[in-house]
Amino acid sequence: MACSRARARAYSSAANLGPGFDALAVALDAYYDEVEVRVCSGGNSVYVDEVEGKFSSGVLQGPNTAAEAVRGLLNMEGVEAEVGIRVYKGVPPGRGLGSSGASAAAAVAAVSHALALEVPVDRLVFYAGLGERAAAGQPHFDNAAASILGGLAVVASDAAGKLRVFRVPFKAWFAVVTPMNPVPQGKTGVMRKVLPENVSFRDAVRNFSRAAGIVAAAVNGDLKSMGALMMSDEIVEPRRRSYVPCYTQVRKAALQAGALGFSLSGAGPSMIALAPSSEAAREIAAAMEESCICCDNPMTVAAEPAPGASVVG
């Protein structure tokens, strides 16, 4: 039985950026996961051998996004193989930083390389997004797209239901604060349940236009406009922020320290602020940490847009 190995890295991400729910996410070089796979021909199973790394203890037993994503890839690419997976967990789970998406992205990138499949990036995003079912109960593609593509990722489905993904390269700086307060099991799914099933036509149009404005501002390097639009969500963030420790205090501190914009990172509890420079990002991160008085052991970091998933071994 012939076997091959590959190891891939994928970075953390911040989804939504305010009004871009399930459509926008930015890869951040704050944290990363690595996944090593051993792929053997002739088998028909996918399993996780080991989860290690700084945040391995936060990974729940049971369905795993990396394994789920690999199963989807093998099934839809028509490949039979036995795949053993080792996950190095460098992205804190359950914190709104795309931890599950990073594992899934690294896994499909590694398997694609090990099998020399040369899977196009849009399909890699699709398979990684399928892996999110293990964490959220349903596929979603924003974090997976950011971790696969890098930079600012935009995801959409066309009239035929085909997933379309786009990478927007841009220069920016972010401050990230991550409260380590306890979160409910299956936090992503729980935080989706607080959202409304229906919204008004007016609110939908306003959010669509603001999300489009974020993309245009990123393309044009207009960080001031991008930051203002990050703070304009009227649908998702207003319903989630009450679940986030010290949201109001941290937001106020970030803006007083010079942040151009502020939003939850995904479903939280992490929060991100857009900064005008790398030095400002560090200063804003310090202010956010100091203000997070109701946060348990908050982690803060200054970050920039990260590259996409890559094979590292």
From Swiss-Prot:
It comes from Aeropyrum pernix (strain ATCC 700893 / DSM 11879 / JCM 9820 / NBRC 100138 / K1). One of its GO terms (cellular component) is cytoplasm. Pathway: Amino-acid biosynthesis; L-threonine biosynthesis; L-threonine from L-aspartate: step 4/5. Its EC number is 2.7.1.39. It catalyses: L-homoserine + ATP = O-phospho-L-homoserine + ADP + H(+). GO terms for molecular function: ATP binding; homoserine kinase activity. Its main location: cytoplasm. This is Homoserine kinase. Catalyzes the ATP-dependent phosphorylation of L-homoserine to L-homoserine phosphate. Pfam families: GHMP_kinases_C, GHMP_kinases_N. Coiled coil: none annotated. It is an enzyme of class 2 (transferase). Gene3D superfamilies: 3.30.230.10, GHMP kinase, C-terminal domain (3.30.70.890). Keywords: Amino-acid biosynthesis, ATP-binding, Cytoplasm, Kinase, Nucleotide-binding, Threonine biosynthesis, Transferase. The lineage of its organism: Archaea, Thermoproteota, Thermoprotei, Desulfurococcales, Desulfurococcaceae.
